[in-house]
Amino acid sequence: MGSRHQVVQQQNRGDVVPGAIKQKSMAVEKKNRRALGDIGNVVTVRGVEGKALPQVSRPITRGFCAQLIANAEAAAAENNKNSLAVNAKGADGALPIKRAVARVPVQKKTVKSKPQEIIEISPDTEKKKAPVLEKEITGEKSLKKKAPTLTSTLTARSKAASVVRTKPKEQIVDIDAADVNNDLAVVEYVEDMYKFYKSAENDSRPHDYMDSQPEINEKMRAILIDWLVQVHYKFELSPETLYLTINIVDRYLASKTTSRRELQLLGMSSMLIASKYEEIWAPEVNDLVCISDGSYSNEQVLRMEKKILGALEWYLTVPTPYVFLVRFIKASLPDSDVEKNMVYFLAELGMMNYATIIMYCPSMIAAAAVYAARCTLNKMPIWNETLRMHTGFSEVQLMDCAKLLIDFHGGSTDQKLQGIYRKYSRLEKGAVALLPQPLLA
């Protein structure tokens, strides 16, 4: 068997006939078929003019094995380079051969996540479509990120709630916290009591009765109330007695026709009833007769007292404006007695005027007196959430009644009825009647 060196020399000299070499090589290949070592589409290396080189058998040494491996790798690399070049150029308008590209299994697994590695048919659009695919993938990812989830929604709501908690509304003061240990304050059900008072205040509220009284007008009533205020102050009676006296007078006039001559008698008997109901030591009948300069006898006073109780059906437990004044003044958190005296001053001016008790309910008169007093004393804020909760009225609802009370304050110095004005001009009342009235828009 000839060596490889001899075979190469014969090819170079050209002594061997090509046909004979071909037949000989085919015969050798039939006898010496080798198992397929590579199932890839690797073309067998051919000799000159596309002729296969004859098989040379020699003992395989380490150096020869390394040379064969190096030659095989070099041939495979050259074939891959040629096939890629053919695909890139697209020779003769033919489609590129996809089988020339050796696909790595890893690339098949990552085709979905990296679409930019896919080889397009047209080489010109390969670089243009890859960024588009990348943008589409990133767009899908961004859409997935923007999709709201339950966790993100709850987180956003919690953040919004925390922002709201950082800016809370005006805090409502617990005005009964200091009276928890006071049994007379009945903190446990004081709110229920005032809810009942507000629901029942219209039942004891007098209607417009002046048209049914032929001998009495609004001015006469104002004179009577002004005189009762002076008598009340002279006897040093409680405020509850004064407000209940006025309520009894109006309710009786709303139910019975009364002559001008009996009007003062009605006031005296009403104060006697209210004193017995509210005071520990009520004034005697002789005291009332004496203060009226003996205009009426004891029998007349007692007889009128009986008539009044019959007309009112002995219904004396009524929510007067004073009942609400106590609660609303407490809700205003006054820092001195000046604010309290101003509230009482404006409330009594309102009770003296007939239009006030007809147009507005007792709770609104009390709330408007508190509002007008805070305006007069420049208390800021004039109306807060604590007052709104306990009174049940907003600032807008109280504006008309408060303006009316402030007008009465401004005109109290000009009119002849000076009983209330003199009472609250004293130093013991803080001289609140001397303060200038505010201007409400």
From Swiss-Prot:
Keyword terms of this UniProt record: Cell cycle, Cell division, Cyclin, Mitosis
GO term, biological process aspect, one: mitotic cell cycle phase transition
Database matches in InterPro entries: Cyclin, Cyclin-like_dom, Cyclin-like_sf, Cyclin_A/B-like, Cyclin_C-dom, Cyclin_N, Cyclins_cyclin-box
Gene Ontology MF: a single term: cyclin-dependent protein serine/threonine kinase regulator activity
Subunit-structure text: Interacts with the CDC2 and CDK2 protein kinases to form a serine/threonine kinase holoenzyme complex. The cyclin subunit imparts substrate specificity to the complex.
Job description of the protein: Essential for the control of the cell cycle at the G2/M (mitosis) transition. G2/M cyclins accumulate steadily during G2 and are abruptly destroyed at mitosis.
Pfam families for the chain: Cyclin_C, Cyclin_N
Signal peptide: none
Assigned protein family: Belongs to the cyclin family. Cyclin AB subfamily.
Gene3D superfamilies assigned to the protein according to its UniProt record, in alphabetical order: Cyclin-like (1.10.472.10)
PANTHER family with a match to the protein in the record: CYCLINS
Top-level taxon: Eukaryota
Name recorded for this polypeptide: G2/mitotic-specific cyclin-2
